[in-house]
Amino acid sequence: MSFGGLFDGGGGGGMQFPFASGFASSPALSLALDNAGGGIGGRMLGGGAGAGSSAGGAMTRDTEAENDSRSGSDHLDAISAAGEDDVEDAEPSNSRKRKKRYHRHTPQQIQELEALFKECPHPDEKQRAELSRRLSLDARQVKFWFQNRRTQMKTQLERHENALLKQENDKLRAENMTIREAMRSPMCGSCGSPAMLGEVSLEEQHLRIENARLKDELNRVCALATKFLGKPISLLSPPPLLQPHLSLPMPNSSLELAIGGIGGLGSLGTLPGCMNEFAGGVSSPMGTVITPARATGAAIPSLVGNIDRSVFLELAISAMDELVKMAQMDDPLWVPALPGSPSKEVLNFEEYLHSFLPCIGMKPAGYVSEASRESGLVIIDNSLALVETLMDERRWSDMFSCMIAKATVLEEVSTGIAGSRNGALLLMKAELQVLSPLVPIREVTFLRFCKQLAEGAWAVVDVSIDGLVRDHNSGTAPTGGNVKCRRVPSGCVMQDTPNGYCKVTWVEHTEYDEASVHQLYRPLLRSGLAFGARRWLATLQRQCECLAILMSSATVTANDSTAISQEGKRSMLKLARRMTENFCAGVSASSAREWSKLDGATGSIGEDVRVMARKSVSEPGEPPGVVLSAATSVWVPVAPEKLFNFLRDEQLRAEWDILSNGGPMQEMTQIAKGQRDGNSVSLLRASAVSANQSSMLILQETCTDASGSIVVYAPVDIPAMQLVMNGGDSTYVALLPSGFAILPDGPRIGATGYETGGSLLTVAFQILVNNQPTAKLTVESVETVNNLISCTIKKIKTALQCDA
């Protein structure tokens, strides 16, 4: 039986009860009420409490208290007497000693109290009130009964532990005496004659102790390496043949493992042959050379830097085992979801807790869990190409630019075995985002571990290191307004298929603090549509489809009224990607861009509108001056697909876009990024206000998949776009993006299953308020961009007939 927090005031993790049955048959303790005034506690166990009580009276009280404690609950009788009798005894004029009246509990009351105590040793106030009402007891009686029962349990447990320790002590004393007797008359084990013992120096004793410790550590490391490498390692195998100039000295005191180059090359001579595969620059038994681990420029948190890197490896292996099992297991771990649910299956958390040990510790109080699994085919050469993308932080963040605000490799703990990604281990830090100012960024520090499961099959797992630094509050604490988040073993399992595709099974399991998330977005996050496996896999499929089209010789171009070369199309797509990345950075307020929030200078702007400013001096691709960004999110009672088609239609932009000059826009060219309608990059031309004014060009990128959609656009100069369309460098083309992010509003359970009521629309604008970087931001500029957002949202609702 497990009593969580029984002996530590209710706040600890609890302990395992060491006995097969409880202590219900043992005599209960007779405990008194403690009172700060000292007047009540002295009277609870006897008839008098005055200073003149005799020794005989004290003996009588002790005898009575002992008799009163015969039942499992009789130690609460004193509490029943703490009513009106206490008031009478407290009066100074009452010198007559009276015997305390005890109210004993009935067997039924004791049975009910004991039954609840076995289920919950620490009942809350509501449970105590219900029990007192049901048993016709005072609430204080129930409260102090549980207090005394816990004290009794603790005391009896301590007595039992003391008895065990005493037995162990007696046993050690007996062994010590036996050894002393044997040392007085030592005998030779070979011939049986008396032996003469030589003196052993203190230094030799220390060396023997150190040798035993190193041997134990070597056994542990070899067992770990056997599991890591997937092949047995013999402790008696000789080290590989090394060149004379690569001979390695012995360590001074401890076994420093050079996993990922952490321990240094000086310790490799103590390891068995196959363990050299962890080290850098040393030949392995297979004849290959292992690339040494590299140190990154990012600063490693001090508390993380103090952790032994072999602990990282143990955590990564445990997380990998959990990921593979979660990707392969079905019912009862994964059960079918309700009809209409965004996911086909949901995690059975009760079965999960029975199947896996929490490798990063128990879920903190107040956290909620979200777990999802999704499988699908991805257009990619092979699974190894996807592994290379996931293990490179830059390519990973580019692939999921709408979800990853910032990614950094803090340390490359292990580069893998034999120059491959098998066994590669990275310590990373990332900022995950939802394109809305109402959802804080999730900042997480985690390990990313890669393993080859079979030929053409790989797995990449992420796991937070919070469990390793859980005793330090600042070890991986989020910064700024970011939300607290823990990444339970999550990742993907990849398998090559004969038709040129790669089957990917994605598992996402996260624990986070929901208190900082806006009520509007909580259903979305709980359903897994914001950070779940469905969104990761849908984004991966869309991006890989786009890359496949770009790598093909025939890029699909629709409505091509302007001839664009292949180089021009690539340059135009590169510019559109930069535009979308800048748009996402302006919405999420990531630390990747130097945005400053204007919390106290926004005047009458609503709390759901985030306003930020940034000074651009000489950054390529941005106009110099003070840039103002404003974003907000609203609920629109329109299906996400309908809202997306309305916003991307150039013929309908006059209904909401002030850049259209009140008329329809013309699509000059369109580059398709996928087979699904809506994934494209377009160049639009707005109608000229007058004959003397040249028309404006607008670059627009639209993306959509099963998880959501975005529409991003920015005005561009005509000469700059002519250069880009001719294949020129788009790095220095200045633009400030604006646009929309569309997400489903999260499923709600209706009469026939899950139902979706509308869309969550995020509107964001970036405008140049002053072309002088040193200029100060004015209140008028802030109000202007706020009015622009409000007016745009109102026009969209009016056009969709949902402004009521």
UniProtKB/Swiss-Prot annotation:
GO terms for cellular component: nucleus. GO terms for molecular function: DNA binding; DNA-binding transcription factor activity, RNA polymerase II-specific; lipid binding. It is found in: Nucleus. Residues 98-157 bind DNA. InterPro entries: GLABRA2/ANL2/PDF2/ATML1-like (IPR042160), HD (IPR001356), Homeobox_CS (IPR017970), Homeodomain-like_sf (IPR009057), START-like_dom_sf (IPR023393), START_lipid-bd_dom (IPR002913). Its main location: nucleus. Residues 47-106 are annotated as: Disordered. The keyword Ligase does not apply. SUPFAM superfamilies: Bet v1-like, Homeodomain-like. Keywords: Coiled coil, DNA-binding, Homeobox, Nucleus, Transcription, Transcription regulation. It holds the Pfam family START. Residues 61-77 have a biased composition (Basic and acidic residues). Residues 146-223 form a coiled coil. The keyword Cell inner membrane does not apply. Residues 95-106 have a biased composition (Basic residues). Residues 305-549 form the START domain. Probable transcription factor. Belongs to the HD-ZIP homeobox family. Class IV subfamily. This is Homeobox-leucine zipper protein ROC5. It comes from Oryza sativa subsp. japonica. The lineage of its organism: Eukaryota, Viridiplantae, Streptophyta, Embryophyta, Tracheophyta. The gene is ROC5.
